[in-house]
């Protein structure tokens, strides 16, 4: 990322430490399957999820917070989505077996 982008990110937080923690947490969310907030054409064409997380933060579409409740809510939503996907796959397999 360009230095001006990093300066913008630093202005969104109260410290370099908080920026690094928030970026790392977002990268972990992306690795866990969280959808990107960036439009497809702006997504990073790299496996470096830290860079993608920083670009997402730079857009302003994500807010920097420390709320544990937000993290828990994200995790619960992710688990629900994953369970729904698995259930849909199981239902599709059952339908194929019936045919």
Curated annotation (Swiss-Prot):
GO molecular function: DNA binding; DNA-directed RNA polymerase activity
Top-level taxon of origin: Bacteria
GO biological process assignments: DNA-templated transcription
Pfam families hit by this protein: RNA_pol_Rpb6 (PF01192)
Keywords: DNA-directed RNA polymerase, Nucleotidyltransferase, Transcription, Transferase
EC id: 2.7.7.6
Annotated family: Belongs to the RNA polymerase subunit omega family.
Its biological purpose: Promotes RNA polymerase assembly. Latches the N- and C-terminal regions of the beta' subunit thereby facilitating its interaction with the beta and alpha subunits.
Name of the protein described by the UniProt record: DNA-directed RNA polymerase subunit omega
